Amino acid sequence: MNGVVAALEEMPPVTRFYTGACVLLTTAVHLEFVTPFHLYFNWELIIRKYQFWRLITSFCFFGSFGFSFLFNMIFTYRYCMMLEEGSFRGRRADFVYMFLFGAVLMILSGIFVQILFLGQAFTIMLVYIWSRRNPMIQMNFFGVLTFTAPYLPWVLLLFSLLLGNNAVVDFMGIACGHIYFFLEDVFPFQEHGKRFLKTPQWLVYLFDERRPEPLPEDERPGGFEWGDEQPEQEQHD
């Protein structure tokens, strides 16, 4: 038990919260506290019946316990953590903003595309963003394929097709990941480019560690006054 607690404490906070929510929700379904019919994404029920929790639960349920759940959770945990501890290290508010931006894109897409659960697409989005920010890393897929990181989302798409899954889910994740990557990592650095995804200050206030303001120079301890006067040397007889 202590080992589990220690492992949880070592997880970065956003990764711990999201993966923990996924496991808890799946456990609740397994124990029949709730059913998937109360969790899936349905825009009509959200708007007309005010079932706003579906905006969250549709991202946190990956199906019942089994190979598919384990596979998705490993990828979700791994790439969420690598992003949080990698390119988003020390920028927790930016990471949360990326979560929110991606979720909004998927919710808008889900209105027009009949997808019941958005968690797998969200995982593919995380994988896509990580892969584009780490283009030189060599990947090995089950010891069969070797390729560089940017090909990973497409390999997962092919694997999903081989398993008979709906490819629209993976395409949605790739598309949302590319939109974020383009707006954050490409367009701002082009001629006449602009950064549109600036993190709101209220998120910075809530999630980023607030560092104390440095003291004025004349109030800082230590140091030596490098002026014309030198410290008098002690006279010895």
Curated annotation (Swiss-Prot):
Record topology, Lumenal segments: 42-54, 119-166
Key words, A-Z: Endoplasmic reticulum, Membrane, Protein transport, Stress response, Transmembrane, Transmembrane helix, Transport
SUPFAM superfamilies in UniProt: Rhomboid-like
Cytoplasmic topological segments: 1-20, 76-97, 188-237
Region (Disordered): 212-237
Highest taxon in the source lineage: Eukaryota
Gene Ontology MF terms in the entry: signal recognition particle binding
Protein name: Derlin-2
Taxonomic lineage: Eukaryota, Metazoa, Ecdysozoa, Nematoda, Chromadorea
